[in-house]
Regions:
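Bacterial N-terminal signal peptides
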Residues: 3-14
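Boundary at the C-terminal end of the N-terminal hydrophobic targeting segment
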Residues: 20-22
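Auxiliary, metal-adjacent structural segments of Zn-dependent hydrolase domains
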Residues: 35-137, 144
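Soluble non-cytosolic domains of exported or imported proteins
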Residues: 90-97, 145-150, 188-192, 219-220
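Structural recognition of the beta-strand scaffold that forms the well-ordered cores
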Residues: 123, 141, 160, 196-201
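Post-HEXXH active-site segment of zinc metalloproteases
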Residues: 145, 163-186
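Active-site recognition of the HExxH zinc-binding catalytic motif
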Residues: 149-164, 198
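Metalloprotease/metallohydrolase-associated module, dominated by Zn2+-dependent proteases
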Residues: 175-247
Length: 251
């Protein structure tokens, strides 16, 4: 009990979730991710995302550790972005593209966000110190074995940080959405609010790929997060009708 209290206190001090779901609650037993996990196995089967290489490979020094690698430029729809693979990694760029194409086209915007002049786009490293991936405004780094659901989670971090440029309160709004929904997404998401957002991004990607029936189910289970994530995903393009359902942040 003491350890649990300390953990909760640490979460609060670090800006973590203000709502902590006890292990024996109904919400915890019916976490949102558990209801859609079966979709992860088939994600991409209905994807219309197509990626085309337009140049490369070019020998470069990658951002993380200045290790040698190869870089390509690619396009998908209206998006243009970079693909970078560390030398010696057992992953062909064609296989990387197959993996990236499994995510719905709106998620490709994150690939472009991390492809500014001094950035590497989607970057594949031999190792990330034990992690499968890292995502932020300037990078999406993955290891060779990271699958599409890992990518979908990291896209959440990238687009959240991009949205924060125009809306510094975006994570406060997300926390308000968590409290309004009163449901846990996953154990990992319960740790801190930005990981909750990453986990929701992952679930939403699977539902978007699966079709309207699954999207509607997700919308009913977590309506506040759903509306806010669609705004983040579509670069703030949210209808007035949808904006009315978003929770207000506390003053």
């Amino acid at each position: 009990l003491i350890a649990a209290a300390v953990a909760i206190a640490c979460l609060a001090a670090s800006g973590g979730l203000s709502t902590v779901y006890a292990a024996d609650t109904k919400e915890k037993q019916q976490q949102v991710e558990q209801q859609f996990r079966h979709l992860y196995r088939t994600i991409g089967e209905k994807s219309s995302t197509k990626i085309k290489l337009i140049s490369g490979p070019e020998a470069i020094k990658m951002r993380n550790g200045r290790v040698p690698g190869k870089r390509w430029f690619a396009t998908s729809g209206q998006f243009k972005f970079k693909l970078t693979i560390q030398d010696g990694v057992d992953l062909k760029v064609e296989k990387l593209i197959e993996r990236l194409e499994k995510l719905p086209l709106p998620y490709v915007r994150a690939y472009e966000v991390v492809s500014d002049e001094k950035e590497d786009g989607i970057a594949v490293y031999k190792s990330l110190g034990g992690a499968s991936a890292h995502g932020g405004k300037q990078y999406i780094n993955i290891i060779p074995g990271a699958g599409p659901m890992v990518l979908a989670h990291e896209v959440g971090h990238t687009l959240e940080q991009k949205a924060k440029e125009s809306d510094p309160e975006i994570l406060d709004k997300w926390e308000a959405a968590i409290e309004a929904d009163k449901v846990s997404i996953s154990n990992y998401g319960d740790q801190v609010r930005h990981e909750d957002l990453g986990e929701f991004s992952k679930v939403y990607a699977a539902c978007l790929d699966a079709g309207e029936a699954q999207l509607s189910k997700l919308r009913k289970l977590s309506p506040a997060r759903f509306k806010l994530w669609e705004s983040i995903l579509n670069d703030g393009d949210l209808s007035a009708e949808d904006s009315e359902v978003l929770p207000r942040t506390k003053n």
